[in-house]
A protein has these predicted regions:
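N-terminal secretory signal peptides and thylakoid transit peptides that target proteins
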Residues: 1-25
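N-terminal pre-ligand scaffold of iron-sulfur
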Residues: 2, 21, 25, 29-94, ...
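Functionally engaged cysteine thiol sites
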Residues: 6, 87, 101
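Alpha-helical protein-protein interaction elements
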Residues: 16-21, 52, 98, 114
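Short cysteine/histidine-rich metal-coordination sites, predominantly Zn2+-binding motifs
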Residues: 96-103, 113-122
Length: 140
């Protein structure tokens, strides 16, 4: 019966050094309490209506919501919990949301997937402007 070669000391030490780094990568994708709400469960006030320009988007990290405004002035809101692995999306470049865990990209104006690995679009939320403030909540 053939014998397996013993792992060198260097190989063992490399593996031991890499294990904590891999764990940090997984921890970076998790919500602080271990679970992130995919959408507000009640209406939440996000900010001033003027924060979202026509053709632009604003990310509200504390509420896991992105709000965009089309050229006609219509507001749209989406949950910023990635549909691939449930990671909170914390980066907005122009109108593109970028998930830090696996690189999925979403259009903040339509909620549609722009780049895999995600295959499902973001969850749409209800949104309105009330007294100059943006209020988002569960879909109607």
């Amino acid at each position: 019966m053939p014998t397996r070669p013993c792992a060198s000391r260097r190989t063992v030490l490399r593996g031991a050094a890499a294990a904590p780094v891999a764990g940090l990568g997984l921890a970076a994708c998790a919500a602080p309490d271990g679970s992130a709400a995919a959408a507000p469960t009640a209406p939440v006030e996000l900010g001033e209506e003027t924060e979202v320009a026509k053709g632009g988007a604003q990310l509200y990290r504390d509420h896991n919501v992105v709000v965009s405004r089309d050229q006609d002035g219509t507001l749209k809101a989406y949950s910023t919990i990635c549909t691939h692995a449930g990671c909170p999306i914390n980066k907005l470049e122009g109108t593109t949301l970028i998930c830090p865990c696996h690189g999925s990209r979403f259009d903040a104006v339509t909620g549609k997937v722009v780049q895999a690995p995600a295959t499902e679009q973001l969850t749409e939320l209800s949104v309105k402007a009330a007294n100059g403030r943006i209020v988002a909540g569960p879909a109607d």
